[in-house]
Design a protein with these regions (language model features):
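Extended, well-folded interaction surfaces typified by the phenylalanyl-tRNA synthetase beta subunit core
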Residues: 1-41, 80-94, 99-101
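Short active-site-adjacent structural elements
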Residues: 56-58, 70, 88-92, 112-114
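A charged, well-structured terminal subsegment
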Residues: 35-44, 101-117
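Fold-independent oxyanion-binding glycine-rich loops
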Residues: 32, 50-52, 84-85, 107-108
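Hydrophobic/aromatic beta-strand patches that form the interior of the parallel beta-sheet core
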Residues: 2, 48, 78-82, 103-105, ...
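Active-site beta-strand/loop microenvironment that shapes enzyme catalytic pockets
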Residues: 43-82
Length: 117
């Protein structure tokens, strides 16, 4: 499993398995330590993506940092948003930098928007 690590305004990915060392970010999120083995984003086939909401056309409402929007400019893996059914909502006005998801997985459904990647 490759997990994201925040470095400035970028997400870098590192190998992680149960028992490996982690550290807690300012937001309280665990991430791999800096010395963990790096993983190139070109080798990642599936990005499990956190979100606050997902629109009916796959537009993702994130947490405001733009980390995943910047990542998805170059990352080519399948972008799967994961949340609860209540987070699959009507669309809102996306901004120019927003990148759509390929799919959304909730406790009640799997929806594919842009299955090609």
């Amino acid at each position: 499993v490759a997990c994201p690590r925040v470095v400035g305004t970028t997400l870098n990915f590192h190998l992680w398995q149960d028992g490996d060392a982690t550290e807690i970010t300012l937001g309280g999120v665990r991430q791999p330590v800096a010395s963990a083995t790096p993983v190139s984003i070109e080798t990642i086939d599936l990005f499990i993506t956190p979100l606050l909401g997902c629109g009916r056309t796959g537009m993702r409402l994130g947490y405001g940092g733009g980390f995943y929007d910047r990542l998805f400019v170059t990352a080519r893996g399948f972008r799967l948003g994961v949340g609860f059914a209540q987070q699959h909502v009507s669309d809102w006005q996306a901004e120019a930098h927003d990148k759509p998801l390929n799919g959304f997985l909730s406790d009640s459904e799997l929806v594919l928007f842009h299955p090609e990647y």
